[in-house]
A protein has these predicted regions:
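Glycine-biased, small-residue-rich flexible motifs in mid-sequence functional cores and linkers
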Residues: 1, 70, 79-416
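Short, small/acidic-rich helices and loops at N termini and domain boundaries
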Residues: 1-82, 404, 411
Length: 416
C-alpha cells in the first residue's frame, strides 16, 4: 500500500542507506511495517534511533500525506515501481518515494545530464547554460537541474525552448514554488516537463534539504555538467556526489579572473571533462543511446535574456542556502574524476611494455597487462581483474598521472 511506502520513506532516525539495506532484507515496506522488535534487532547498521522509528506504527501522517497528494494532483513513484529509474536505484542512498508533477520521462531510455552552477552567475555563464541546456534538449537528452536562479533555471529554460525534456529536482515539497519569483519557470516545467521531490508535500526549504537533494540530481544523470561555480559552491557538492556515484563530471571552462569560475575551473585541473557544447557531453553516450541522439545546430542568438542576467545579478544569499563545499572539495575529486581524450582507440604493439611498467604496484601492473592488446571497456577490465569499481578508478587515475594509460570516449581505456 502507498501508505506503507510513505510511512517507510519518512521514518525518523532511519538513513537512506539503511532503508536500502532494509529493502534487501524484506520484500516491501509493508513487511517492514509489520516486523516486530525481534525481527528488526538483528539487522546490520540498525541504531537505537532507527529502531524507535521503525517501531512507531502510526500511519496517520502517511494517510494525511496521501490525501494532500490526491488534492494537489501529486503523483507518487516508489522504489519498486517499474518506472523508478535504474540509475537512481543503484546509488547507495536512493529515495524510497518520489513525489512529482507533470510528465515523468523514461530516464533509462535517454541520456540524462544534470546541469548545475551558481545562482549569482555571470552573463557568460548564463549564456553558456542556456546554450548547452538548449543543445542537450534539442539533441535528445534529458536536462535535470534544481530550478534555482542562475545556472539551474537558465539551463532548464534552454531545454524548454528546444522542446526537450527537463526535470526540476526540488529541495522542498513538489507543491512549493521556490524561489517564489521563479513561478513562471516552475509552471512551464510542470506543464512541459516534470517537477520532482523526495520531500513530502508542504515540506519547506531548509539548509539541509538542498545538499540532500543533490544526490538525486547526480543519481538520475549519466553525467553532471558544472557550468560556473565559485570555490564554495553547492554545485561542487553535486560534482563530488556524481564522481562518487561513478558519473562523468563535465565542466565549461571559465574566465580565470572571475571568482564565480574558480571552483569549476579547479574541477578541470582535477580531471573533469572540458566541454564547450551540449553535443560534446551527449557524444559520450552515443554508443549507449544510438537511436535517441541526433546532432542539432544551436541558433546563433541563443543567449541568456536580460531578465535572466538581471535576476542573477540581483540574487541575494538565501537563508536556506546549500551547505558550502569544504575548501578541499575540488581536490577531493581528483582521484574520482575521469579525464577526456579525443584520441580514437587503436590496437598497438607495446614492445617496451616491461620497461614502462617497472616500478608499478602489483594492481597497476595487472591493469596495464589487460591493455596490452589495445583499448578495453572499463567494465571488461573490472570483470577480468576482479577489482571493485572504486578501486579500479583510483588506480586508473594514478596510471594516468604516471603517463601509462589514457581515457577514451565510450568508457574505454588504453595504454599510451
Amino acid at each position: 500500500m502507498l501508505t506503507h511506502w510513505i510511512w517507510f520513506a519518512h521514518r525518523p532516525g532511519v538513513s537512506d542507506r539503511l532503508k536500502a539495506v532494509l529493502m534487501e532484507h524484506f520484500c516491501d515496506p509493508e513487511d517492514i511495517f509489520y516486523a516486530d522488535e525481534a525481527a528488526l534487532r538483528g539487522l546490520p547498521e540498525l541504531t537505537r534511533e532507527a529502531l524507535e522509528g521503525l517501531l512507531d506504527k502510526n500511519l496517520t501522517s502517511s494517510e494525511e500525506i496521501l490525501e494532500v497528494c490526491d488534492r494537489k494532483q501529486l503523483h507518487l513513484l516508489t522504489y519498486q515501481d517499474a518506472g523508478y529509474p535504474a540509475r537512481l536505484k543503484n546509488i547507495p542512498d536512493p529515495p524510497m518515494v518520489l513525489y512529482y508533477k507533470g510528465r515523468l520521462p523514461e530516464f533509462d531510455a535517454y541520456p540524462t545530464v544534470g546541469i548545475v552552477g551558481t545562482r549569482k552567475a555571470s552573463a557568460y555563464g548564463l549564456t553558456a547554460a542556456k546554450r548547452l541546456g538548449y543543445q542537450i534538449g534539442k539533441c535528445g537528452g534529458i536536462v535535470v537541474s534544481g530550478l534555482a536562479f542562475g545556472i539551474d533555471g537558465t539551463a532548464m529554460s534552454g531545454a524548454l525552448t528546444a522542446g526537450g525534456k527537463t526535470v526540476g529536482v526540488l529541495g522542498c515539497g513538489a507543491d512549493i514554488v521556490y524561489p517564489p519569483s521563479n513561478g513562471a519557470l516552475f509552471r512551464d516545467v510542470e506543464r512541459y516537463g516534470c517537477i520532482l521531490s523526495e520531500f513530502a508535500p508542504g515540506t519547506p526549504p531548509a539548509k539541509w534539504t538542498f545538499p540532500k537533494r543533490n544526490r538525486i540530481i547526480s543519481g538520475l544523470s549519466n553525467g553532471v555538467l558544472v557550468v560556473e561555480a565559485p570555490e564554495r559552491s553547492g554545485a561542487l557538492i553535486t560534482a563530488r556526489l556524481a564522481a562518487e556515484q561513478g558519473r562523468d563530471v563535465f565542466v565549461v571552462p571559465g574566465n580565470i579572473d572571475v571568482p564565480t569560475c574558480a571552483g569549476s575551473n579547479a574541477l578541470l585541473r582535477d580531471g573533469a571533462i572540458l566541454v564547450s557544447s551540449g553535443w560534446e557531453v551527449l557524444s559520450e553516450y552515443q554508443a549507449m543511446f544510438p537511436d535517441k541522439l541526433r546532432r542539432e545546430d544551436t541558433p546563433v542568438r541563443m543567449t541568456a535574456s536580460p531578465e535572466e542576467v538581471r535576476a542573477a545579478a540581483e540574487e541575494t544569499p538565501l537563508q536556506v542556502a546549500q551547505k558550502p563545499a569544504r575548501p578541499s572539495e575540488t581536490s577531493n575529486l581528483k582521484k574520482k574524476l575521469e579525464k577526456k581524450s579525443i584520441d580514437n582507440p587503436a590496437p598497438t604493439a607495446y614492445s617496451d611494455l616491461d620497461a614502462r611498467l617497472s616500478g608499478l604496484s602489483e594492481d597497476e601492473r595487472v591493469i596495464a597487462e589487460c591493455l596490452k592488446n589495445g583499448a578495453r571497456l572499463v567494465d571488461d577490465v573490472i570483470a577480468e581483474t576482479g577489482l571493485s569499481t572504486g578501486r579500479l578508478l583510483g588506480i586508473l587515475t594514478m596510471l594516468e598521472l604516471k603517463g601509462i594509460v589514457r581515457r577514451l570516449p565510450g568508457k574505454q581505456i588504453a595504454l599510451k
